[in-house]
Amino acid sequence: MKKDEIKALEERYAKAECPVVSNNSAHRHTPDVPMVIPEINPHHIEIIPSQRKRLGTKRGFIAVKSNCSLQSYLPAMAVINMKYPIDRAIVTTYQAISGAGKTFETWPEMVDNLIPYIGGEEEKSEQEPLKVWGKIEGDKIVKAAAPAITTQCLRVPVSNGHFAAVFVSFENKPSKEEILNIWKEYKGAPQELELPSAPKQFLHYFEEDNMPQAKLHRNLEGGMAVSIGRLREDTQYDYKFVCLSHNTLRGAAGGAVEMAELYAAKGYFD
């Protein structure tokens, strides 16, 4: 379906008083549609009353998930950014074939192969974080102006699990120990509310240089946790590190279920 057709369909469901939690990208940049990572920006659900007013609904609304690639790197960046604002970042993602709806049986060309381009992914990976980091102003979510993010997105011969290599610079550089402590101690709304799908520990850091690995860690905590490793200082940026998440669990279906649980816990399905 075309994007305008999907937008119209989702609005029809909402106007029929059916809450819509969507993985589709059609409404991601609609100003009064929240694009929520439950552990990062749960407060964005507060835009729903404004959206309901526009749609003329009492119970129906539209909420969307961000692109699956963001789930690998944005959580690790976002929780640091809450205390130490990030000035700029370079992100390269290495995305599994299941992100294209494929398996090695249906896409044999990907065996022993790599494709250095995924249509539309780089634009999503640069722009969508700014909405997640945005603020509610009146009846809309206004995107953040920073950090400046530049990305490259590659398709790699892995069945499941999106990986990211991240370089970040800060307005005021924290110590490595401060970053590690932020990752270790962070708990978001899903953990505080004990949502059924939420991982007990959202962010897991691995000290070993060869960790995390897709085959070993993508299913951590039911595929809902984010794995991080190799944090170290960089010669051009302040720090660099790698991240991993399960793209069809945390990044898609599982994340959508967790998001629905958050809306239910906050009374938006009543």
Region locations from a protein language model:
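Short, charged, low-complexity patches
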Residues: 122, 249-253
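N-terminal Rossmann-like NAD(P) cofactor-binding subdomain of oxidoreductases
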Residues: 1-110, 114-117, 146-148, 220, ...
